[in-house]
């Protein structure tokens, strides 16, 4: 069954108590490595939280439901200079969140899966934020309502990709305009950007 993080090592030691000594020693070494990795992760996470806490751009981006410290910092680092994008709607394409377009001389054009071009870490962070907004956040917002409509019409995976693309546009717009998120923010920008759900 499920074992709490704090009780994991104790449970493993209990299981290997009567095992072969060489096998038990190798497991002990792996437990030591695991503990060191977790401690290092926790230290790095505390540093990240301090960086975000003192960064006005990250704090602004975190006003969007589903966007936490890691997502905010990943997006800021990935974009670097927001003014290099003339239009907010192009940011999603930069991170590979727009559908690929298939063309031939004899058939009708159609859109496929997202292109997955650009920085994969930023794309994954945006998708994680989109999934959090749709599946965990309960507070209403125009952006969440838009995503849930796509989920009902198509699938949750399509909705996550579409909301991630929209988030890229919204986060960029907020950054450039120095505007915090509000629950109706997605309504106007949805209409203006005319984004299509990913396939």
Task: Write out the residue ranges for each language-model feature.
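Conserved acidic
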Residues: 29, 33, 118, 155-159
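Glycine-rich, often acidic, oxyanion-interacting loops/wings at catalytic, nucleic-acid
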Residues: 1-60, 121, 164, 185-193
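Low-complexity, acidic/Ser/Thr- and charged residue-rich accessory regions of DNA metabolism proteins
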Residues: 106-110, 144-199
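Intrinsically disordered or highly flexible coil/loop and linker segments, enriched in small
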Residues: 21, 43, 50, 135, ...
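Short alpha-helical linear motifs
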Residues: 51-56, 94-101, 111-117, 169-171, ...
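A residue-level signal for conserved active-site and pocket-lining positions in enzyme catalytic cores
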Residues: 37, 126, 167
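Phosphate-backbone recognition surface of nucleic-acid-processing proteins
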Residues: 60-63, 69-156
């Amino acid at each position: 069954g499920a074992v709490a993080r704090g009780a994991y090592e104790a449970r493993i030691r209990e299981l290997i108590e009567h095992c072969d000594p060489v096998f038990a020693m190798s497991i002990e070494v792996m437990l030591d490595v695991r503990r060191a990795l977790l401690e290092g992760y926790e230290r790095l996470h505390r540093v990240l939280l301090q960086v975000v806490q003192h960064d006005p751009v990250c704090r602004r981006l975190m006003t969007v439901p589903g966007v936490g410290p890691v997502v905010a910092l990943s997006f800021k680092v990935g974009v670097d200079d927001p003014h290099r994008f003339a239009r907010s709607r192009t940011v999603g394409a930069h991170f590979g969140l727009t559908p690929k377009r298939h063309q031939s001389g004899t058939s009708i054009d159609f859109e496929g899966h997202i292109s997955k071009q650009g920085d994969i870490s930023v794309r994954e962070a945006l998708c994680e934020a989109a999934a959090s907004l749709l599946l965990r956040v309960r507070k209403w917002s125009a952006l969440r309502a838009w995503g849930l409509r796509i989920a009902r019409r198509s699938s949750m995976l399509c909705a996550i990709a579409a909301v991630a693309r929209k988030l890229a546009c919204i986060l960029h717009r907020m950054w450039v305009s120095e505007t915090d998120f509000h629950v109706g923010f997605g309504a106007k920008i949805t209409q203006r950007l005319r984004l299509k759900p990913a396939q």
